[in-house]
C-alpha cells in the first residue's frame, strides 16, 4: 500500500491588509506572513480547508 501524502506549495500573492481577522489567522496558521513567501505543506484535508478559505490570496501548486 502506498501511504505517501502529496505536498503542495503555497505562495501568498496578495496582502492580508483589510481582510477579515479570521483570514489573517489562517495565513499565520499556514506559515505565511509576507507577500511572495512560499511554504510546502502536506496535502491533508485540514490544509485544504484552510487554503479554500483564503484561496483568493494564494497561488497553489501541486508537488
From Swiss-Prot:
Its Gene Ontology cellular component terms are: cytosolic large ribosomal subunit
Record has Signal as a keyword: no
Q: Which UniProt keywords apply?
A: Ribonucleoprotein, Ribosomal protein
Entry's InterPro entries? Ribo_uL30_ferredoxin-like_sf, Ribosomal_uL30_bac-type, Ribosomal_uL30_ferredoxin-like
User: What Pfam families does its record include?
Assistant: Ribosomal_L30 (PF00327)
Top-rank taxon, per record: Bacteria
Annotated GO biological process: translation
Which molecular function term from Gene Ontology is one that the record holds? structural constituent of ribosome
Give the multimer and partner information: Part of the 50S ribosomal subunit.
Which protein family is it in? Belongs to the universal ribosomal protein uL30 family.
Q: What's the protein called, per UniProt?
A: Large ribosomal subunit protein uL30
Organism phylogeny: Bacteria, Pseudomonadati, Pseudomonadota, Alphaproteobacteria, Rickettsiales
